[in-house]
Every structure is written in C-alpha cells, then in structure tokens.
Amino acid sequence: MLSLIEKLKQVKDFRKDKGKRHPLWIVLEVIILGTMLGYSGYRELGEFAKNNRHRLSKEFNIIPERVPSYSTIRRVMMGVDWQSLLKMFNEWALEEYGQRDDINWLGIDGKSLKNTLKNPNNEQQNFIMFVSLFSQESGLVLHIKRIENKKGSEIDECQAIIEDCTLQNKVFTGDALHCQKKTISLIAKSKNDYVITVKGNQKNLYQRIQDLSNSSKPESCFLEQDNSHGRKISRKIEVFKVRKDERQGFENLRRVIKVERKGSRGDKTYEETAYYISSLTESAQVFAKIIRGHWKIENQLHWVKDVIFEEDKSEISDFQAASNWSIL
C-alpha cells in the first residue's frame, strides 16, 4: 500500500491551492478503499468516507469532520487527468509485480465501458474501452491502455502495450482479433512468445492450418474431461509442427494447435473446433493449460468489474470520470 501511495502522490493535481483541504492522493486513496469495499458512485463513496471518518482521519492524519465529501470526490473524479492516473498505475503495477515468479502467461484483451456509450444508433457512436495485460497465474493486471472508440482501435492499443512492455521470456495470449502479423512481429521483437487464436479473419492462414492438421500426424496429443459447473466437456488437443516455409509471414510460428471440444449443458449438446498458432514448442498438455488460462481475463477481470464493481451499470457516463473510475 505504501508504494501505491507514493505513486498516487505523483498524479498531477488539477486544483488550485486556494480552498483545497486535502492532497489529491488522499482523495484518490479514499476512492480506492471505498471501491474495494463495494461502494460505487459519488454519493456512496461520500457515505463511505463519512461513516468511516474516524478510521480515515487516523490513517491519513486529517480532522474527522473534514474527510473528503461527496462533492470533493465528484470533482476529483471528473477533473483529474486520466492520462496521469493511467501512467501512475502502469508504472506501479510493473514495479510492484513485474518480477514475480508467477507472471509468465499474459492474456491481452479489451473491455468496453457500456455506461459511456454515446449515440448508439448512428455513425457517431462512441464509447470508452480499456485494453488490459493480465497475468493468468496471479490474476494481476500489469498494464492498461485506454481507447476512445472513434479515435483508436483495440488492435493498435494491444500493439502499444507490447511495445511498452519491458518483460521478457513471457507468453502473450490473445483472441483472433490479435492474429495480426504486426502484433506477432512485435511480440517476437520483445523477446516473448505467443499463443493466438486463428479464425476466418486470416483466411489464408486459417485454410493452411486446417489443411496441415488434416494431412499431418500430430507430434503431441492430450485428452481431458471437464464435468464442473453443470456441464460436461471433452477436449482433444493436438499439436502440429510448422516448417519455416509454412509460416506465411507470421514470425517465429513453430506450432499449430487444434482443439476439438464436445460438450453438453442441460439438454443442449455442441461440437466445435478451434485453431491456434504459437512460437512455443510445448506439449499438447501445456498448450491446453495456456489456452484455457487465457479466458481468466474474462472471468477474473472483466466479470469482476461488471458484476462485483458494477462498472457497466454505473451512472458515471462522463468520459473523463468513467476512465478514472475504471483505472482505480
């Protein structure tokens, strides 16, 4: 917590000194603490500060009657520069967690903020999205980028995260949107590896790996069953070697992974086949774990923000305030 406070002190304060009761970092810390305890919205956080004023006054050495109010919290959330807050978070997360032993498989994915949607029914539609770099093993977010829909794309921000990332010898995982030659080239340049989904957005590659998996013998195979959460799923994972002349411009492509899934939930059954490309040369069992782990970014990050913190239901629709809220 002390390292976070030191970083919060570096966030630029937009307020004038006259009439200012609290340093910006104290207001931000109160917002973080309240959010962690399930308070959302300006008024709820104002109530949190009021109800816990004696504890907060002791921790932050402020007068109990002068803990940050609803109006102060609202003003700060709408006024603090999201770029300064974002820079602070990214520096803090990498310094605090970047050297941990359980930071190896890094999922990358975007999440839109539904509460910021403007003009949903015409060409002027706009909203805020955040792209996160998420550790599968630890459940920690290591880097985030913010996009305004009309001014950027998830692909561009994903590539920017890879360029900014100073970690090496890690494995980036991503969905088919990020099966881009430039993205994969940047991963290779950063001295990291990848496991990326392939779908029809890369038609030639998709057809080639289908042909490869149908005409070649897998070098590794793994079968697994999953009977949890009221569903039954069987998975068959096969790994195929890729020659250098078969890479089609995807740098360091060494293996194709084919995953066949068969399952049922209640009375409904389904079958599907998915394909992945990778620079790794692991066994089918290891690839199975990495591929399953990628979806933790959905159920351990995006789900938590939506269901626990009710991000999409938030009444905060102002782009600046909503961006700051999502970062914190």
Q: Where are each of the predicted segments found?
A:
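Basic, amphipathic alpha-helical segments enriched in Lys/Arg and hydrophobic/aromatic residues
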Residues: L24, G293-L328
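An anionic, glycine-rich sequence signature occurring as long contiguous blocks
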Residues: I196-G293
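Short coil/turn segments at secondary-structure boundaries
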Residues: M88-E91, I103, C221-E224, L301-V307
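Conserved, well-structured functional cores that handle cations and Mg-NTP chemistry
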Residues: L2-L4, D17-G174, C179-K182
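A residue-level signal for conserved active-site and pocket-lining positions in enzyme catalytic cores
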Residues: V30, D109, Y194, E298, ...
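A short alpha/beta connector and helix-capping loop motif
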Residues: Q125-M129, K181-K199
